[in-house]
Amino acid sequence: MKYFLPLIIALSIFIHPVNVFAEELILAGGCFWCLEHDLESLKGINFVQSGYSGGDLQNPTYENHEGHQEVVLVDYDSRLVTLPKILRLYFRNIDPLDGKGQFCDRGDSYKPVIFFKDKTEESDAKNAIFAASNELRVPLEKIYV
């Protein structure tokens, strides 16, 4: 019996190996369900999960998330899709000119935000903002990084 649990753990890792190329990104851009749906269509996205981020409230809920933005956690395979490609799709699915919400969703909970975990992601986010700004031919000052 003492060998059974380690055997099960070893087999589960072998059957479902850990993807060392998996990366995560957190994006806010209006209603999280809309953003979740659009990002799931991109090849290389493992999953997209809705939630809240950016606030101080512990355990925010749909009814009570003051100070938080509606966000999506994007888990992706960096061998199949790049962060710049994900951010390009992100900018095509939000209104980057509106920092006070998205479409009919208004307020801080719906403003566009790109959360980053390191300098590389920060640089990619700023480059994506610059590229979108050039494409639209207007400055994008309403995107929060």
For each feature predicted by the language model, list its residue ranges.
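Positively charged n-region of N-terminal signal peptides that target proteins for export
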Residues: 1-4
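N-terminal signal peptide c-region/cleavage motif recognized by signal peptidases
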Residues: 15-17
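Flexible coil/turn and secondary-structure edge motifs
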Residues: 20-145
